[in-house]
Amino acid sequence: MGQGLWRVVRNQQLQQEGYSEQGYLTREQSRRMAASNISNTNHRKQVQGGIDIYHLLKARKSKEQEGFINLEMLPPELSFTILSYLNATDLCLASCVWQDLANDELLWQGLCKSTWGHCSIYNKNPPLGFSFRKLYMQLDEGSLTFNANPDEGVNYFMSKGILDDSPKEIAKFIFCTRTLNWKKLRIYLDERRDVLDDLVTLHNFRNQFLPNALREFFRHIHAPEERGEYLETLITKFSHRFCACNPDLMRELGLSPDAVYVLCYSLILLSIDLTSPHVKNKMSKREFIRNTRRAAQNISEDFVGHLYDNIYLIGHVAA
């Protein structure tokens, strides 16, 4: 009751002062329009520094294309970057819209080489009727086939003349692409040790700290989930390659491939110990130094301590 009387008195007071509801709505509408104009002015000021790109993105060939950016009006580098995120199916759909881009061989060549860095066919005289657009589709098809059956995938690449029947060429192809499923790749390399040998030699570990080099190695050649003969083979090949890339360091530290092999196993075990939530009592730095120097003699205590610090700070070497 008291609140109702207060509103009546307040309304009478406002009317005496010249207030009206219609006048309030008119003033509120004017205020919002002024705020909108200020916002638009600020937006134009923000884009003024990049006015060329702004107008490129806003340009349209016709009203039917409103809201649809034409890649043909963008710089070639920007168009290439956008298209590189599309898969083969989406690229085919995009080529139906952008006819000029669909027939641009330089664009398709860039897409091929950015996704599959090495193919034997790159270094050959192109056959009659060759196009990089067709090659891109074949590379995509072959990669999908490999991810279902590695042997059939490699045979597909060879049948299309994309890869030569050479372990070194296959190793280069694997090393320069990330489209292959790592589980299928691990099975293939376990069966094709000749390809594995050439793949290891493509790595350059010069002047790299041992744990960092091991991480890079396992990023390209994934470690098996369980300990076994294949893991031993990988570590053995890595140890010899690491020593071959760092002969001066090996002489300075007095390390041999066998000693590096022991250190690699120690790093893997330490990685599991420090990162596994199931291990409650973590290995201390002193314990790691003692155990490692017991297995591999003549190794500097400081060097082994730096190995521990690297795993503790950065993490697993084979994650």
UniProtKB/Swiss-Prot annotation:
Domain SEC7 intervals: 146-276
GO MF annotation, one: guanyl-nucleotide exchange factor activity
PROSITE patterns per UniProt: FBOX (PS50181), SEC7 (PS50190)
Gene3D superfamilies, per database record: 1.10.220.20, 1.20.1280.50, Arf Nucleotide-binding Site Opener,domain 2
Listed InterPro entries: F-box-like_dom_sf (IPR036047), F-box_dom (IPR001810), FBXO8_F-box (IPR048003), Sec7_C_sf (IPR023394), Sec7_dom (IPR000904), Sec7_dom_sf (IPR035999)
Gene Ontology biological-process annotations: regulation of ARF protein signal transduction; ubiquitin-dependent protein catabolic process
Flavoprotein among keywords: no
One of the record's GO cellular component terms: ubiquitin ligase complex
Function: May promote guanine-nucleotide exchange on an ARF. Promotes the activation of ARF through replacement of GDP with GTP (Potential).
Annotated protein name in UniProt: F-box only protein 8
